[in-house]
């Protein structure tokens, strides 16, 4: 008699369809509910839960729907048994085959700490690195899954346009053509993409200034005062959100523009902080007081008595939506004046 054989019915669970990013192997699930707690408490969406009791219990999504958030990729890292894995990365490489490089995310203004795993010359995946000062242990789905876009439509060699068509060229030939064009040009303009490295941007800056040109660094037409860097850099840090009792959002939608920052604001809100919004009211993952949509609201706030608020740690976050308006410079100046009036309120220009 074989006493070691398990003769009871074995537990089997159907896999879930959580969308194109997260692959599921639910027979591995041990019902630890880490994924449920993350989506509910950190991401702020109630789309996962546990049904049944005992051996019939299983983790599932609400009505079998896919996850609708900018952060659910983090449940891949949280799952202790491999029931939730990255669908784009699955079965493409082994961890010991990868070269691991620490880097900084450039998909939003938060600057999350990440690890880039490469195999040969190909980027295979991005993983979060713990950094309490910025992203804690989370990254957005845009950051986590943008790597596959780095493989396609890449320029592998320089090209020269002749008779309206591009033809491949060598680097010496391309640089020679560029030198001739620059020497014979009366005006020179240079454009730098969002994903260009700092070294390349600095080299272009030296080139333009060497030709007597004017350098202007501005993101998406933001009305930033070039002569007063302190006006837009701000005095607050990301960590200060954890201690803030009042948070003001001006022209910002952090849930879309910086999901990890939004999760940090939600954590402060859950602790008891109040959140105010100036601008279009957006769908956030926490309750917020909509103060108004017009920029003149900031001026009205300056006229109020702030003695009760001055003793509380507060933060003003100015988003890109406010800075790209025609009156973006005035909004930034008004926000800075409000920050100074609410001393010791801190000022954080974001996104």
Residues of each region from the PLM?
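Intrinsic disorder at enzyme termini
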Residues: 6-7, 136
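Generic anion/oxyanion-binding catalytic loop in active/binding sites
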Residues: 18, 61, 163
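Extended, Lys/Arg-rich, non-catalytic nucleic-acid recognition/anchoring regions
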Residues: 21
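Catalytic alpha/large subunits of respiratory electron-transfer oxidoreductases
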Residues: 25-26, 31-32, 36-37, 41-43, ...
């Amino acid at each position: 008699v074989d006493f070691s054989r398990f003769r009871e019915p074995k537990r089997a669970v159907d896999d879930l369809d959580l969308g194109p990013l997260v692959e599921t192997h639910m027979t591995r699930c041990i019902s630890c509910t880490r994924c449920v707690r993350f989506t509910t408490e950190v991401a702020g969406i109630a789309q996962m839960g546990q049904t049944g009791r005992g051996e019939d219990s299983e983790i599932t999504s609400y009505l079998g729907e896919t996850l609708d958030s900018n952060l659910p990729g983090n449940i891949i890292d949280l799952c202790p048994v491999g029931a939730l894995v990255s669908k784009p990365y699955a079965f493409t490489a082994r961890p010991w085959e990868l070269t691991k490089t620490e880097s900084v995310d450039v998909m939003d203004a938060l600057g999350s700490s990440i690890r880039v795993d490469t195999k040969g010359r190909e980027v295979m995946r991005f993983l979060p690195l713990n950094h309490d000062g910025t992203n804690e242990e989370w990254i957005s789905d845009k950051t986590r899954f943008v790597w596959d876009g780095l493989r396609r439509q890449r320029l592998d060699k320089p090209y020269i346009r002749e008779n309206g068509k591009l033809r491949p060229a060598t680097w010496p030939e391309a640089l020679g053509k560029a030198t001739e064009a620059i020497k014979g040009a009366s005006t020179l303009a240079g454009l730098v993409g969002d994903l260009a490295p700092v070294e390349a941007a600095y080299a272009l800056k030296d080139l333009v200034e060497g030709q007597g040109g004017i350098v202007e660094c501005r993101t998406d037409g933001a009305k930033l005062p070039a002569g007063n860097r302190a006006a837009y850099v701000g005095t607050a840090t990301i960590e200060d959100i954890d201690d803030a009792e009042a948070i003001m959002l001006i022209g910002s939608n952090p849930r879309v523009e910086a999901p990890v920052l939004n999760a940090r604001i939600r954590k402060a809100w859950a602790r008891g902080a109040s959140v105010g919004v100036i601008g279009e009211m957006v769908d956030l993952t926490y309750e917020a007081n909509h103060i108004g949509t017009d920029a003149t609201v900031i001026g009205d706030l300056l006229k109020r008595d702030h003695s009760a608020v001055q003793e509380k740690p507060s933060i003003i976050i100015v988003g890109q939506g406010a800075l790209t308006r025609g009156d973006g410079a005035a909004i930034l100046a008004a926000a800075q004046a409000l920050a100074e009036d609410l001393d010791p309120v801190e000022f954080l220009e974001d996104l």
